[in-house]
Amino acid sequence: MSLSGGRSSDRPIILERIRSAILATYIVFTHESTQDQQELDLYQDKVGATIAGHPLKVLAAYGPQEALEGDGPEGVVIVEFPSADAARAWYDSPAYQAIVQHRVKGGRFRAVLVEGV
């Protein structure tokens, strides 16, 4: 279906799909606390292999930080993807899902997908 044709009720869905496919999207991981360093070490050893074939760029990883409001996390990782679809493809990939258990067992984290503007 073309963007100029079809039912007008389809247009918001089509436009949202286009928007999702072209806007930079970020996954922000905040490491709130550590429960099991060995599990986190396993995750760290394996996460690099999950990147192959995925268009992503690590923008920040456990660098210096300053909490402007509230308590600061132990660490922050910000990963950029070319689209929300690309971000979900990596996060939902069998390779990443096979290791995410180590991060979850190793500490308290937040993972947030944020679309750019």
For each feature predicted by the language model, list its residue ranges:
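Short S/T/G/P-rich N-terminal loop/turn motif that feeds into the first structured element of a domain
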Residues: 13-75, 82-92, 115-117
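Intrinsic, low-complexity polybasic segments
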Residues: 2-7
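C-terminal structural segments of small proteins and small subunits
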Residues: 88-112
